[in-house]
């Protein structure tokens, strides 16, 4: 039996209206529709409109359109109801078809129509049509309608026509926060974040209070330009206005502090959040990774898993980046196991992080397998493979990948050639390096960067051709930076040209007056040359400026745990065994005729003390732990935050020969693969 019974004619319209309002299923609505037809009311636009709105409430867009199309003379209100339903259900092209039907039938346009149609133009990528509607809006007398004009403003902003958008903005009376947001979005979409921030400040000065959505958007603009001052001004404004900081606002604040390197503040905001979603955790983890806090990034990732949150692509990438920084290969591979491998192979963002991790852990053979398995590749992935192969000594293979890039129709960029040139530097391939360097501008019409010049200086310096290297620096179209001068300094070390090294270090000190390492190296050059007074002057200058040498840290991963060492570090539980192992190795090296190279320690330290300090540099302690904790034949992988000193480099070669172990050390410049008494860098780094 039907639940719908339409009574006498005098009250049936009112009762149908009531039945429509209380209908709780689509079947109820269909029964009402049947009753309308039976009582010849299916052309009553008022009742049909009520029924249509109710069907749209249940997202029955096809049935709604059926009701509409069977109405003999649909009016503008019926059109507006269906247009509103279509827009809310993301049927933007269908919305535009309805609008064209309105125009075809010559119906009077309602102020409610334009905002919806203009929104559909934006979402259907029909902005040209939206701009064309501007004259119609004016013609129909809606040029003072805030909703219609704000929708037009969104069209102009989204099209990048910001001058026109601003003119329109100035014409709108009683601008609401929605109007300001529309113009603001245009600036951010066009990458003009600084102007967007200034617009927000102007809005606040005019007494318009932003909503939380706007706050998130302006904080995101601050993130893009690294504007911490404006970000903190916004936070202060929110506190003065007693605005609540929801999770979106707080997460964006975490992102801002992380972008600006203020990790303590980022963590403070993070810890203050009662509820954190995966986006918040990922933001904090990536912040640690990008600000050189890899241990904290890994710890937070593990804590996130304890909260039963499934990692997303951003948290995984942050975790892998942290593992890459520490050379924590086993830990990284454990993290990979948390995500389906197919997802890595189809997600370019994650695949890039995975290849980068393998490359930085000295396991590029595994990274290259990932690269080969990927069906789709872009220039970022190609560059990751080229750079990873080159830095791990597989230079010819990196050239082959470059050839594959061209065959796939992928255009190389500056990073592509940077990877290729790094490979040429590490392998000493001068002619190949010159070929790639010239191809950057002559073949591919790309602009050479200071990093490209730095590689060429490094290449000449490696060959001992310091005159060519220095000439290239003088001919550079831009001012040489610390990378370029540092490359020349490496060449000076190779040929022991202390005079040029002194000149280079003075340039480095001028560029990086805060870098204590440059002062230390200059002091050591003076001391080696017997220029004690000048060496003392440099040290006095350091003391007056309160400068201290950056401590050298080394890390080694064993069974998923990262162990950290400083020079002369005795904090490790196995310190006694570590030092005993180094003592045994030292005795064997002395029997082989090895004498420590004490020039790598400050000159004002006694010779015996110099040898003791050198003997316990952080990388030696890490290697010793690896030797006593792993099986014979297992590769030992160590990461150091600074350049490996000359003495440690010689010691590593001898240890690899004595123990018959492969030792891979990644310093802040390159990989060193020590095997059977030799290093892959050929003693140039």
Swiss-Prot record:
What keywords tag this UniProt record? Repeat
What Gene Ontology terms for biological process does this UniProt record contain? RNA modification
Query: Region Type E motif: start and end of each range?
Result: 484-559
Q: Does the keyword Membrane apply?
A: no
Task: Please tell me whether the keyword Repeat is annotated for this protein.
Answer: yes
Q: Name one GO molecular function term.
A: RNA binding
Q: Which InterPro entries match?
A: DYW_dom (IPR032867), E_motif (IPR046848), Eplus_motif (IPR046849), Pentatricopeptide_rpt (IPR002885), PPR_At4g14850-like_plant (IPR046960), TPR-like_helical_dom_sf (IPR011990)
* Intervals holding PPR repeats: 75-109, 110-144, 145-175, 176-210, 211-245, 246-276, 277-311, 312-346, 347-381, 383-412, 413-443, 449-479
Give the start-end ranges of region Type E(+) motif: 560-590
The UniProt annotation puts the region (Type DYW motif) at 591-685
Q: Which family does it belong to?
A: Belongs to the PPR family. PCMP-H subfamily.
Tell me the protein's name: Putative pentatricopeptide repeat-containing protein At3g08820
The opening ranks of the lineage are:
Eukaryota, Viridiplantae, Streptophyta, Embryophyta, Tracheophyta
This protein's gene is called PCMP-H84
């Amino acid at each position: 039996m039907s639940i719908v019974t339409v009574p006498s004619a005098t009250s049936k319209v009112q009762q149908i209206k009531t039945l429509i309002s209380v209908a709780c299923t689509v079947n109820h609505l269909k029964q009402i529709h049947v009753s309308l037809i039976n009582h010849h009311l299916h052309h009553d636009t008022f009742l049909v409109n009520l029924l249509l709105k109710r069907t749209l409430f249940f997202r029955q867009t096809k049935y709604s359109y059926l009701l509409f199309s069977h109405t003999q003379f649909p009016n503008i209100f019926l059109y507006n109801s269906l247009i509103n339903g279509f827009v809310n259900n993301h049927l933007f092209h269908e919305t535009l078809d309805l609008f064209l039907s309105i125009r075809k039938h010559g119906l009077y346009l309602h102020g409610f129509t334009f905002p919806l149609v203009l929104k559909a133009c934006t979402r259907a990528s029909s902005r040209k049509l939206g701009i064309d509607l501007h004259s119609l809006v004016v013609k129909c007398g809606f040029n003072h309608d805030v909703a219609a004009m704000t929708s037009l403003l969104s069209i102009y902003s989204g099209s990048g026509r910001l001058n026109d958008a601003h003119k329109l903005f100035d014409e709108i009376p009683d601008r609401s926060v929605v109007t300001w947001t529309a113009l603001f979005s245009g600036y951010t979409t066009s990458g003009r974040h600084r102007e967007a921030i200034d617009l927000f400040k102007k809005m606040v000065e005019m007494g318009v209070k932003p909503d939380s959505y706007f706050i998130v958007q302006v904080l995101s603009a601050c993130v893009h330009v690294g504007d911490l001052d404006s970000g903190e001004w916004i936070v202060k404004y929110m506190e003065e206005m007693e605005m609540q900081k929801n999770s979106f606002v707080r997460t964006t604040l975490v992102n801002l502090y992380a972008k600006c390197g203020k990790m303590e503040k980022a963590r403070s905001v993070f810890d203050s959040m009662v509820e954190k979603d995966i986006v918040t955790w990922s933001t904090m983890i990536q912040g640690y990774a990008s600000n050189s806090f890899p241990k904290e990034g890994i710890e937070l990732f593990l804590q996130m898993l304890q909260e039963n949150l499934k990692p997303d692509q951003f948290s995984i990438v942050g975790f892998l980046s942290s593992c890459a920084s520490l050379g924590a290969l086993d830990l990284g591979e454990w993290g990979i196991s948390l995500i389906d491998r197919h997802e890595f192979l189809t997600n370019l963002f994650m695949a890039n992080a995975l290849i980068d991790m393998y490359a930085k852990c000295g396991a590029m053979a595994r990274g290259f397998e990932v690269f080969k398995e990927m069906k789709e590749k872009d220039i970022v992935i190609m560059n990751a493979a080229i750079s990873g192969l080159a830095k791990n000594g597989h230079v010819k293979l990196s050239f082959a990948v470059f050839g594959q890039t061209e065959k796939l129709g992928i255009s190389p960029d500056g990073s592509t050639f940077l990877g290729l040139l790094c490979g040429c530097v590490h392998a000493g391939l001068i002619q190949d390096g010159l070929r790639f360097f010239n191809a950057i501008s002559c073949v591919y019409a790309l602009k050479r960067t200071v990093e490209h010049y730095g590689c060429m200086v490094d290449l000449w310096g490696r060959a001992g051709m310091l005159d060519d290297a220095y000439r290239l620096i003088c001919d550079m179209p831009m001012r040489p930076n610390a990378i370029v001068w540092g490359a020349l300094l490496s060449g000076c070390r190779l040929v022991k040209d202390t005079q040029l090294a002194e000149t280079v270090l003075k340039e480095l000190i001028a560029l990086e007056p805060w870098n204590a390492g440059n002062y230390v190296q200059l002091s050591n050059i003076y001391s080696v040359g017997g220029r004690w007074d000048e060496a003392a002057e440099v040290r006095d200058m350091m003391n007056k400026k309160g400068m201290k040498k950056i401590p050298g840290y080394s890390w080694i991963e064993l069974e998923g745990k990262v162990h950290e060492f400083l020079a002369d570090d005795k904090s490790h539980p196995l310190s006694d065994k570590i030092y005993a192992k180094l003592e045994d190795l030292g005795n064997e090296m002395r029997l082989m005729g090895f004498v420590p190279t004490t020039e790598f320690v400050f000159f004002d330290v006694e010779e015996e003390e110099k040898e003791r300090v050198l003997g316990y540099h952080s990388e030696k302690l890490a290697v010793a732990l690896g030797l006593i904790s792993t099986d014979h034949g297992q590769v030992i992988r160590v990461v150091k935050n600074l350049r490996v000193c000359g003495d440690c480099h010689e010691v590593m070669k001898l240890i690899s020969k004595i123990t018959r172990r492969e030792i891979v050390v990644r310093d802040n410049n390159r990989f060193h693969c020590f095997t059977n008494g030799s290093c892959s860098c050929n003693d140039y780094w």
